[in-house]
Amino acid sequence: MSIFTDLNTSRKWQIDQWLSAVNSHIEKIQQYGHSVVNPTPLLADGFEIKTQSPVVWQFPDGHDAPISNFASQQNWLRLLISMSVITETEKYRHLAFCQSEYFLNRFVDENSGLFYWGGHRFINLDTLASEGPESKSMVHELKHHLPYYEFLHQVNPEKTRHFIQGFWNAHVEDWSCLDLGRHGDYARQRDPDVFLHSRHDVVTPANWPELPLTKGLTFVNAGTDLIYAAFVYARHTGDAHAAAWGKHLYRQYVLARNPETGMPVYQFSSPLQRQPVPADDNQTQSWFGDRAQRQFGPEFGAIAREANVLFRDMRPLLIDNPLAMLDILRHQPDAEILTWVIAGLKNYYQYAYDVNSNSLRPMWNNGQDMTDYCFKRDGYYGKAGTVLKPFPLEGDYLLPLVRAWLLSDDDDLHTLIVTMLSRLEKQGIHQSASPFLLLAITELAHAKQSAQWAEYAWQMAEILFKRYFHHGLFVRSEHHRYVRLDDPFPAILLTLIAACRNKWSEVPAVLTQGGYIHGDYRINGESRVIYDTEFIYPEKLIH
């Protein structure tokens, strides 16, 4: 019995309104999301609310392609499955199954096992051709996509297993030094024995601050998806080698942490310099060597490594990676991994969290505060003259802390959660409200059986519902131009409803903000590199 179950009766009218809204959202996407010229079960990643035209990628050569990127529709699948669970009707699950089955039967590379999807590749909704930004060569990339493997495995177990084999095989360039990269080659033949490679640590803490030199960029956002996939593979096949490889890869990020502070790293290697460093500081390709050392080395010395930078977007390290690891541990408990996850979070916040301003200090992972530092030269991290400022602590950062506490009952985490919540409450619920914060508070209320936090979660859900539900769809606001299928809020709202209906454990966990496409895009006749999530979907309506 959940603290939320009483609400199922006392506020039934509100729950019914929310479910009606989610149903409207799903029906409108089904009505307008398919191709008009060549209807199939595939859906556009999003469409214009006024015209119902699909979101397109504008290529620099002048042609436009309506985007259907299955990797950017995994939260949509979670939404459909959650709706079937809560309403006890199969029609939503059937929609998810038909769409997934159609994709898996037609858009899988037989050689590599990889799907035609991801950060640099999608299916043209009208022609069904595989397309992608030319500058990215349509390579395979997943960065915190965390696909809904549980459901994909139900639809087609063999192709899901083959994908994970191909995913690891295509992204690990050299197993002897664990040289891996965010880009995978579709030309690499799938290896069914991919997890039988021998394992040895490539990071030696005694050599710190020196890290292995690799051609590939061992970014944590790319590594997280590999780790997550390996554990899913182990769960469905019983292959202990896959789980061992997932843990081994995560261990390299742990070994690369600062030995004094224990603060985490963005990657466990430094880019190998393969070409002479150019005079132009704006040429920041990784083959010129470590970009942080090049831009900041003269001032900061050995600590200036890409791995040690904690002054750019912290979501991959503090939200996305911990959420993936904690979801793994929910299914496959491992005390050592849990200790690693919690240590990374606690050590970071010990040094970087400013309670008074409720913000995160920009830092090197040796604990050196970079607040107000002015860049001396151009480079990978920004232009000369850039001044670093603290990052406001958004409510999203609370979700992994809550989930880590739920698995560990760690007193320090609980203290940190209470402190952050008190600071967020002072901002006011309207200002602090976000989908991930709603999820965090819902899970906290459920765990503590707290009527106070259950009521707070309910109030936040009402605020977010009014903010996001317009035109019969869940959108960023009534002023935004596009609906986006991978928006997590509808699925998060269903998580709250599931708690009210005692179906908490039956709905899929929400783990990610969704997928993206990244590459060259035509803007006013010129080519610019964009993310669709940062350039297309934030567009407002033109009145």
Curated annotation (Swiss-Prot):
The gene is pelW. Keywords: Copper, Cytoplasm, Lyase, Manganese, Nickel. GO terms for molecular function: carbon-oxygen lyase activity, acting on polysaccharides; pectate disaccharide-lyase activity. It is found in: Cytoplasm. Catalyzes the formation of unsaturated digalacturonates from polygalacturonate or short oligogalacturonates. It comes from the Bacteria. This is Pectate disaccharide-lyase. InterPro entries: Pectate_lyase_2, PL_2. Its cofactor is Cu cation; Mn(2+); Ni(2+). Its EC number is 4.2.2.9. It catalyses: [(1->4)-alpha-D-galacturonosyl](n) = 4-(4-deoxy-alpha-D-galact-4-enuronosyl)-D-galacturonate + [(1->4)-alpha-D-galacturonosyl](n-2). One of its GO terms (cellular component) is periplasmic space.
